[in-house]
Amino acid sequence: MSLCISDYLYLTLTFSKYERQKDKRPYSERKNQYTGPQFLYPPERIPPQKVIKWNEEGLPIYEIPGEGGHAEPAAA
C-alpha cells in the first residue's frame, strides 16, 4: 500500500494496521500464559561424559570423569 505525500514522494507502508494491535487482555491473563506443567520445572540436566581442561597452549584436553585418564585431544 502506498500513500502519495507529494507529486514525487510516496510513503510505502510495509505492515497492516491489524498486525500491530495492543494486547487487550489484563496483565493477570497475559502473565498466566507462560505458566503450566511445561514451564514450571526445568528439564533434568544430562550429566557430562567428558571434562574439558585447557593446557598452556590454549588447546582443550578432554578427561573422562572417574577414570582420571585422557581422551583423545581435539583436532586442529
From Swiss-Prot:
This is Antimicrobial peptide lumbricin-1. Coiled coil: none annotated. It comes from the Eukaryota. The keyword Hydrolase does not apply. Residues 1-14 form a propeptide. One of its GO terms (biological process) is defense response to bacterium. It comes from Lumbricus rubellus (Humus earthworm). Displays antimicrobial activity against the Gram-positive bacteria B.subtilis ATCC 62037, S.aureus ATCC 15752 and S.mutans ATCC 25175, the Gram-negative bacteria E.coli ATCC 27325, P.putida ATCC 17426 and Serratia sp. ATCC 21074, and the fungi C.albicans ATCC 10231, C.neoformans ATCC 34881 and S.cerevisiae ATCC 44774. Does not possess hemolytic activity. Induction: Constitutively expressed. Not induced by bacterial infection.
